[in-house]
Structures are given as structure tokens and as C-alpha cells.
Design a protein with these regions (language model features):
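Extended, low-polarity transmembrane helix blocks
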Residues: 1-35, 52-136
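Membrane-interface interhelical connector segments
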Residues: 34-48
Length: 136
């Protein structure tokens, strides 16, 4: 069995299977909030500046995940910068998703885990890229 498993080739680009859908979700959410208005911020009872950072943070994090992956794709394209952009984008995603979960005012941690699956998955996706960067 060990020999069989060793014959299966590694797929070093598998991080794109997580990177692209996560980036697309955040780019879509960011674009949907533009133009940023105070009325939209008031719907969620947020200050305008927080709403502005959320909108452009979502857009920037999505673009950063794609850009960071491209920058780290080759040694000629400054791989350390790609890693840094990927980590920052993952951190941004984690911060935004923490805020989204927090605004929902869950009664308990268990309620978040059981009923807020989508946001939890996005949070863990951001955490993955914040911790691993482009070294996947």
C-alpha cells in the first residue's frame, strides 16, 4: 500500500482549489458593497468608516489572494512578496469574518459552529492562508 501511495504524484498547485473560490466570494462581496454609502452602513449599525474598510477589505483580500498566488508562482516574480500578500489577505479575511460572525450576535460558540457554517468555513479559509501563506 505504501508503494502505491508513493506512486501518486504530488499536486503542488492544489492551493488554487481553495484560493480561487475564496477569492471569488470575497471579490463578489466587495463589489456588491460599492458604492459604499452611509445608508448601507446604518443597516448593519456600523460606522461609515468601518463599512468602507469592510467593502474595500473584501475586494482587496480577494484580489490579494489571487495576486499573492501569482507572485509566488515563480522565483522570477518575487516569491516573498507573494507570500506576504497572501498572508495579509488571509489575515484580512479572518478579521472581516470575525466581525461578520460577531455582528450576528450568536448566543454561544456552539450556535456559531452549528448554524453559521458558511462564515466559519470562510474564516478557516482566511486562517489557512494567514498561517501558510504561499508555502502550500
Amino acid at each position: 500500500m505504501k508503494n502505491l501511495l508513493e506512486k501518486i504524484p504530488d499536486f503542488y498547485l492544489s492551493h488554487w482549489l481553495l484560493r480561487l473560490p475564496l477569492a471569488i466570494v470575497f471579490i463578489q462581496q466587495g463589489i456588491a458593497k460599492i458604492p459604499v454609502t452611509i445608508e448601507d452602513a446604518q443597516i448593519f449599525d456600523l460606522p461609515y468608516i468601518v463599512w468602507w474598510f469592510v467593502a474595500y477589505g473584501e475586494l482587496g483580500a480577494g484580489l490579494g489572494l489571487i495576486g499573492g498566488g501569482i507572485l509566488s508562482f515563480s522565483d522570477k516574480l518575487v516569491p516573498w512578496l507573494g507570500d506576504l500578500v497572501t498572508r495579509f489577505s488571509g489575515f484580512t479575511i479572518g478579521c472581516i469574518m470575525t466581525g461578520v460572525i460577531w455582528i450576528g450576535e450568536p448566543e454561544s460558540f456552539l450556535e456559531v459552529i452549528l448554524y453559521d457554517n458558511f462564515h466559519v468555513i470562510l474564516w478557516f479559509g482566511g486562517l489557512f492562508f494567514a498561517l501558510r501563506g504561499s508555502r502550500t
